[in-house]
Amino acid sequence: MMNFLRNRLVVLGLVLLATVLLYLLLPSMRQGSMEPSLEVQQRMGLMAATPPPPPPPSSVNITVRTGQLPGDPPLFFREALPVDSAGRQILPRLQMVLLHGQAFTSKTWEELGTLSLLASSGYQALALDLPGYGNSPDSESVKSDQSRVDLLKRFLEALGVRAPVLLSPSMSGHYALPFLQRHSAQLHGFVPIAPVGTRGITPQQYHDIQTPTLIIYGELDTNLGAQSHKNLIQLPNHTVVKLAGARHACYMDKPREFHRALLDFLSKLD
């Protein structure tokens, strides 16, 4: 009788221990079942299978300053001045002016690392907020091609920019292409990135423009990228870079390849 009671107590003890262990394990089991594994998350599109690599850090600390040019309209800009490998300010190898597309501002070039990269490579980099974008107010005074040309001229003259390389993506072609037509001799180089407005230039006008040009567009940009490429290759002094796997804003999809092509082009100009 005593042995029977002892055995029963042992069994009850084991059952109680198993119950306690199961209770303790249930929260982690429930949590694990609710959260998909990294592999499952990648299949579900909850996270990128391969995150884009960050831009390589510059070995030199670059300061990007901001300014506001008075006038109608006032123009906000960002500037990175060229420095040597020790971080000392130097005379620029070239001056570069960067415009932007409709969904972007001058801050895009700062966040992408383009301004710092140019400055650490010896170039003065100026990025402009076009009227109605970023910190530059809109204005009725820039509704014609000539008024937009005058705006760029005012910006360049006020900041002492002479013979710059002009970079123009997408929407900013409304400013850059008329300027190129009228003042191509004032540009040391031109970098169109699938700009609008390329159909408004005649074959003869293209032929007369001798400015060295780097045409950049994304492989997947079959609309404006392909259309602008077809027109821009009429420029007699051009080079083409097509960024594989990149969309309309190809510099955002492939920043390293974009920067490499840009620096290579600039190195052949100075």
UniProtKB/Swiss-Prot annotation:
<keyword id="KW-0325">Glycoprotein</keyword>
<feature type="active site" description="Charge relay system">
    <location>
        <position position="221"/>
    </location>
</feature>
<protein>
    <recommendedName>
        <fullName>Protein ABHD14A</fullName>
        <ecNumber>3.-.-.-</ecNumber>
    </recommendedName>
</protein>
<comment type="similarity">
    <text>Belongs to the AB hydrolase superfamily. ABHD14 family.</text>
</comment>
<dbReference type="InterPro" id="IPR029058">
    <property type="entry name" value="AB_hydrolase_fold"/>
</dbReference>
<feature type="glycosylation site" description="N-linked (GlcNAc...) asparagine">
    <location>
        <position position="61"/>
    </location>
</feature>
<feature type="active site" description="Charge relay system">
    <location>
        <position position="170"/>
    </location>
</feature>
<dbReference type="GO" id="GO:0016020">
    <property type="term" value="C:membrane"/>
</dbReference>
<comment type="function">
    <text>Possible role in granule neuron development.</text>
</comment>
<keyword id="KW-0378">Hydrolase</keyword>
<keyword id="KW-1133">Transmembrane helix</keyword>
<feature type="glycosylation site" description="N-linked (GlcNAc...) asparagine">
    <location>
        <position position="237"/>
    </location>
</feature>
<feature type="active site" description="Charge relay system">
    <location>
        <position position="248"/>
    </location>
</feature>
<keyword id="KW-0472">Membrane</keyword>
<keyword id="KW-0812">Transmembrane</keyword>
<dbReference type="Pfam" id="PF12697">
    <property type="entry name" value="Abhydrolase_6"/>
</dbReference>
<dbReference type="GO" id="GO:0005737">
    <property type="term" value="C:cytoplasm"/>
</dbReference>
<dbReference type="InterPro" id="IPR000073">
    <property type="entry name" value="AB_hydrolase_1"/>
</dbReference>
<keyword id="KW-0735">Signal-anchor</keyword>
<feature type="transmembrane region" description="Helical; Signal-anchor for type II membrane protein">
    <location>
        <begin position="9"/>
        <end position="29"/>
    </location>
</feature>
<dbReference type="GO" id="GO:0016787">
    <property type="term" value="F:hydrolase activity"/>
</dbReference>
<keyword id="KW-0963">Cytoplasm</keyword>
